[in-house]
Curated annotation (Swiss-Prot):
Binding site for Zn(2+): 441, 505
InterPro entries with a match to the protein in the record: ThiC, ThiC-associated_dom, ThiC/Bza_core_dom, ThiC/BzaA/B
Molecular function terms, GO-annotated: 4 iron, 4 sulfur cluster binding; carbon-carbon lyase activity; zinc ion binding
Assembly and oligomerization: Homodimer.
Chemical reaction(s) catalysed: 5-amino-1-(5-phospho-beta-D-ribosyl)imidazole + S-adenosyl-L-methionine = 4-amino-2-methyl-5-(phosphooxymethyl)pyrimidine + CO + 5'-deoxyadenosine + formate + L-methionine + 3 H(+)
The protein's annotated pathway: Cofactor biosynthesis; thiamine diphosphate biosynthesis
GO cellular component: cytosol
HAMAP family from the UniProt entry: ThiC (MF_00089)
GO biological process: thiamine biosynthetic process; thiamine diphosphate biosynthetic process
Lineage: Bacteria, Pseudomonadati, Pseudomonadota, Betaproteobacteria, Rhodocyclales
Name of the protein: Phosphomethylpyrimidine synthase
Cofactor note: Binds 1 [4Fe-4S] cluster per subunit. The cluster is coordinated with 3 cysteines and an exchangeable S-adenosyl-L-methionine.
Named cofactor requirement(s): [4Fe-4S] cluster
Residues given in the record as [4Fe-4S] cluster binding sites: 585, 588, 593
């Protein structure tokens, strides 16, 4: 074993940078109808408005928080022990699961029995895996269709609302100042939601109904009780996914756990472990036991490792064992490329970039080697039986997505999409949750066609897209080329956006790349929420704009998506503490700040007892008299 891998098992420590609370923020918990429903949010405290701007208190702002216990100073974090099993009681009280005596997966048992892996193994609590009792179905969709509102659904409703109703009522009850603040913070431009059904308030019953219809999913494997329930759907806040994972060329278990904790700190709603290197099973165990967000995988990657990378040697039996292995570890959703059909493969021959999906290319090679449809397609109902025994959601993979804008919206891509719609119907027959993966590389004017076709052919199952990248000319900046497409398709109705880092197409991302990708995609998701008119989406923008106008620099930093970078950029040119209260920044300096000039006009108006328009006119008249008295010279000697 190498030193890094030995270290992770014996002396593993959490990344200190990932557990510090964000500046001027604290974790709060909102209790539901029972004491074990405690929903986390982040409260950002603000300073008072300076006397020169009216001297008024500014209320805290509440934002969605994906970081789990990591940013709670009261939590004891030890990644060797893992996180508390938040959902264990909810799962047990339903009475439809059984604890297995041992792992069901042959490969899982082999790994557990191999003493050479002891140095790598997660040392914390090893729970016996759970599985649905014979004849039972344990999916959130199954409960929803039976009219059951689960604790997970109530948790999600509280989480999505972000205390907005109570917050508004408390402001209105605080007298004239609070009423003014309520009007200012809650002002929001009407959006265009393209036929979505976003309510003013999310209720547990609304969550249940959306899951029952298949318009939203709750990724929550019964073997991942550590996860904090979240929802992916068109009528909820737009979510983002962060990809992590080792490769044959680098990274270690320690680095991947650090990437996970780093991802959720900055706002990753889910994390996909796309490991293709060594010790995939052990890496995944460490990640899941320490993750408060849903974990997704592409099981065919690990199955391929089991046959030494030879796609043609893959079998249904190997893949089935891999699904069970990962389901019993607690993976919450599987990307499965079951829509890559034999007849679609020739349609990629004239593409500029062919088949760019790893999973898609693996299955295409298998189909051609055996000249028949893939076992993912022919055994799809068997896969559904596994999914509903553990509540693993499908993320139906777009194995034929375009890898260049040249190939966008071609026959292969859209043919596969139609097949994914047909597979969705089969999964729903089993009450298995489904989301649909989407492109890819698509120029801006062709994005809406993708969204419209997906809604039509996949019956409004949540869409989950990689970008899309809107141009191919910017290697090193593909977080931006894709962020443009992500904001656009999120506005049109995509439920979750898969981040792209600056390293896309170039290399394995490091921690800084992960952060860049997440911040870019949080920005895209928020822009989409604003454009859709999602209730309350503009509160944070209004608070930050007010702080900016009042030169409350620290509040500006703290209300932003990345307080550290905002402060760093400000302090590059104005590092002194006095600059944190200055009425200007280094862009315009003290005499040309537009906001300072506007405030001067307001002060002048107040002194003169007139409105701002009259103040501007009076000011112009005063300056005209000064000009004439000084000799009416355009240029003066100074």
């Amino acid at each position: 074993m190498n030193a890094k891998e030995h270290f992770i098992a014996t002396e593993a420590k959490v990344d200190e940078a990932a557990i510090a609370p964000l500046p001027n923020s604290r974790k709060i918990y909102v209790e539901g109808s029972r004491p074990d429903i405690r929903v986390p949010m982040r409260e950002i405290r603000q300073s008072d408005t300076p006397a020169s701007f009216g001297a008024e208190p500014n209320p805290p702002i509440f934002v969605y928080d994906c970081s789990g216990p990591y940013t709670d100073p009261a939590a004891k974090i030890d990644i060797r022990s893992g996180l508390p099993a938040l959902r264990a009681g909810w799962i047990a009280e339903r009475g439809d699961t059984e604890q297995l005596a041992d792992l069901s997966s042959e490969y899982g048992r082999q790994r557990a029995a191999d003493p050479r892996l002891d140095e790598l193994r997660f040392p914390g609590l090893h729970r016996k895996p759970l599985r649905a009792r014979a004849g039972a179905n344990v999916t959130q969709m199954h409960y929803a269709r039976r009219g059951i509102v689960t604790p997970e659904m109530e948790y999600i409703a509280i989480r999505e609302n972000l205390r907005r109703k109570d917050y508004l009522e408390s402001l209105l009850a605080a007298g004239p100042t609070g009423q003014k603040m309520a009007a200012l913070l809650t002002r929001q431009h009407p959006g265009q939601n393209f036929g979505a059904a976003i309510p003013n308030e999310i209720t547990p019953e609304f969550v249940r109904d959306e899951v029952a219809r298949g318009r939203a999913i709750i990724p929550a494997n019964i073997n991942h009780p550590e996860t904090e329930p979240m929802i992916i759907g068109r009528n909820f806040l737009v979510k983002i996914n962060a990809n992590i994972g080792n490769s044959a060329l680098g990274s270690s278990i320690a680095e991947e756990v650090d990437k996970m904790t780093w991802s959720i700190r900055w706002g990753g709603d889910t994390v996909m472990d796309l490991s293709t290197g060594k010790n995939i099973h052990e890496t995944r165990e460490w990640i899941i036991r320490n993750s408060p967000v849903p974990i997704g995988t592409v099981p065919i990657y690990q199955a391929l490792e089991k046959v030494d990378g030879k796609a043609e040697d893959l079998t249904w039996e190997i893949f089935r064992d891999t699904l069970i292995e990962q389901a019993e570890q607690g993976v919450d959703y599987f990307t499965i490329h079951a829509g890559v059909l034999l007849r679609y493969i020739p349609l990629t021959a004239n593409r500029m970039t062919g088949i760019v999906s790893r999973g898609g290319s693996i299955m295409a090679k298998w189909c051609l080697a055996h000249h028949k449809e893939s076992f993912l397609y022919t055994h799809f109902e068997d896969i559904c039986e596994i999914m509903k025994a553990y509540d693993v959601a499908f993320s139906l993979g777009d194995g034929l997505r375009p890898g260049s804008i040249y190939d966008a919206n071609d026959e292969a891509q859209l043919g596969e999409l139609k097949t994914l719609g047909e597979l969705t119907d089969i999964a729903w027959k089993h009450d298995v949750q489904v989301m649909i993966e989407g492109p890819g590389h698509v120029p801006l004017h062709m994005i809406k066609e993708n969204m419209d076709l997906q809604l039509e052919q996949c019956k409004e199952a949540p869409f989950y897209t990689l970008g899309p990248l809107t141009t191919d000319i910017a290697p090193g900046y593909d977080h931006i080329t894709s962020g443009i497409g992500a904001a656009t398709i999120g506005w049109y109705g995509t439920a979750m956006l898969c981040y792209v880092t600056p390293k896309e197409h170039l290399g394995l991302p490091n921690k800084q790349d992960v952060k860049e990708g997440i911040i870019t995609y949080k920005l895209a998701a928020h822009a989409a929420d604003l454009a859709k008119g999602h209730p309350g989406a503009q509160i944070r923008d209004n608070a930050l704009s007010k702080a900016r106008f009042e030169f409350r620099w620290e509040d500006q930093f703290n209300l932003g998506l990345d307080p550290d970078k905002a402060k760093e950029f400000h302090d590059e040119t104005l590092p002194k503490e006095s600059a944190k209260v200055a009425h200007f920044c280094s862009m315009c300096g003290p005499h040309f700040c537009s906001m300072k000039i506007t405030q001067d006009v307001r002060d002048f108006a107040a002194q003169q007892g007139v409105d701002e328009a009259e103040a501007l006119q009076k000011g112009m008249e005063v300056k005209a008299v000064e000009f004439v008295k000084s000799g009416a010279e355009v240029y003066r000697n100074v």
